[in-house]
């Protein structure tokens, strides 16, 4: 599924891409799965699975981390480039991209029960978890390879997406399910602190502070973002649902 239109005068059109596909697209597959449930038409489900499978093959590095952008040839579908748009460099670890991968493949497992998808979500999470420069509060830098780490801006949106995915992951019959929940709990404790949660009526009435949209584009740097709040609230809902079940 192509992510961006490369025609016209947009910045995307100036990158020389033919068919750019971003890891963010994994977040859109849930809509296709739902479309099949609502319509009874398996076409949507099949497209989602095809996209997930191709992304699994082309977008990940051996260590479990992912590229942001894969540019495919319009002619034959081969990979032309593996790059970034919002990360520090093509080979760097853009944190929100890793978050999208963890969340997206957890959803794909939920909808298909294909263990390969869950294994990828876990592998990408373990990669992030084991990075030596992951901050103690578990809120990632916007890019884990940014040259100004540890002074680099944090990205609360990445943290909230990862936490929400981990809560879902913790509900599956996995040997490390408890550790996924514990990691998510620690993220949520950090996000709920005054370091990241704004005072009532401040921060443009957003909940979370300190997210990053795209530093390479000098866009949305150290600001509140609506999707940071969305996945934070979703994570809170999942956390409370799990706690109610445990009573």
Protein language model regions, located:
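Glycan-recognition and catalytic cores of secretory/periplasmic carbohydrate-active enzymes
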Residues: 1-247
């Amino acid at each position: 599924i192509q992510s961006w239109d490369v025609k016209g005068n947009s910045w995307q059109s100036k990158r020389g891409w033919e068919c750019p596909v971003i890891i963010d697209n994994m977040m859109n597959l849930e809509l296709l799965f739902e479309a099949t449930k609502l319509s009874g038409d398996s076409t949507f489900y099949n497209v989602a699975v095809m996209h997930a499978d191709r992304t699994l093959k082309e977008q990940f590095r051996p260590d479990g981390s992912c590229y942001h952008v894969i540019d495919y040839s319009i002619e034959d579908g081969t990979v032309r480039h593996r790059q970034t748009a919002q990360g520090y460099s093509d080979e760097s670890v853009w944190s929100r991209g890793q978050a999208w991968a963890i969340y997206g493949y957890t959803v794909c497992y939920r909808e298909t029960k294909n263990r390969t998808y869950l294994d990828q979500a876990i592998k990408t999470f373990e990669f992030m978890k084991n990075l030596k420069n992951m901050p103690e509060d578990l809120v990632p830098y916007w890019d884990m390879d940014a040259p100004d780490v540890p002074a680099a801006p944090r990205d609360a949106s990445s943290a909230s997406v990862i936490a929400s995915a981990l809560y879902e992951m913790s509900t599956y019959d996995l040997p490390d399910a408890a550790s996924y929940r514990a990691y998510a709990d620690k993220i949520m404790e950090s996000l709920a602190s005054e370091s990241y949660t704004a005072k009532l009526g401040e921060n443009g009435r957003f909940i979370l502070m300190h997210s990053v949209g795209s530093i390479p584009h000098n866009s949305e740097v150290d600001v509140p973002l609506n999707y940071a709040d969305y996945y934070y609230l979703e994570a809170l809902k999942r956390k409370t649902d799990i706690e109610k079940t445990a009573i």
